[in-house]
């Protein structure tokens, strides 16, 4: 019974831990509304001398609040020494009043929303923001609430500085921004969490199935084997038939501590390994139930 209780308790504890793990993993998963990241393909065209150069690359990412649309235009810089376009009075050097244009703006100095609004108010078709110096070509999806009507993408600092230098040299640069691929960075976390939970579930079910049918049978077999070992040990214990003159029959000797009767001639007694004696009819059932001497607790299976 003790083994069964332990096994049942172990299963209950494991089940409880597995349930708590599942809840933790589910709560740790990202919100189903988590945004995907959309890359931006930039088709860059400019002329150097008589050569027309065209570059196509997955150079940027769309902002979180940007429409996912194709947009094109000549690339224009903010006027003045500061390229962050944080001042609402910032103007842009447009080549022609009717040509569509894209603002190339440096990150920093104010929020993305403010930069984008400044360019949008001046008539930009879209906004390209390049990252801080020292960040290489690292990009991330910008947050710019309130500017959902204009395309906004981020490109790396290296690519941004390359475009900046071309335009500052008077090179006419045109860019077509197209929607690239969708990435879901939270998906790997979701898959890993799901895999961990499923692995734990399968492991628990395997152990549960392995132990559940085995537990009761194992306990029963163990008890049967123990009884058989006790019977075998009892059978090896010495027997005597008391005769007149034996010291056990003397008045000052102890009685049988199991039945409390005095010993009489012709009584059959069992002598344990600890040398204590008892009526055979009394001690054999006792040993089957307890397997120890009633007086000194000596275990007959350990001697």
UniProtKB/Swiss-Prot annotation:
It is a single-pass membrane protein. Residues 1-34 form the signal peptide. GO terms for cellular component: cytoplasm; endoplasmic reticulum; Golgi apparatus; late endosome; membrane. Gene3D superfamilies: 3.50.30.30, Zinc/RING finger domain, C3HC4 (zinc finger). One of its GO terms (molecular function) is ubiquitin protein ligase activity. It comes from the Eukaryota. CDD domains: PA_GRAIL_like, RING-H2_RNF128-like. Keywords: Glycoprotein, Membrane, Metal-binding, Signal, Transmembrane, Transmembrane helix, Zinc, Zinc-finger. The chain crosses the membrane at residues 186-208. Glycans are attached at residue 43. The gene is RNF148. It comes from Bos taurus. Residues 65-167 form the PA domain. It is found in: Membrane. Disulfide bonds: none annotated. This is RING finger protein 148. A zinc finger (RING-type) spans 256-297. GO terms for biological process: ubiquitin-dependent protein catabolic process. InterPro entries: PA_dom_sf (IPR046450), PA_domain (IPR003137), RING_finger_E3_ligase (IPR051834), Znf_RING (IPR001841), Znf_RING/FYVE/PHD (IPR013083).
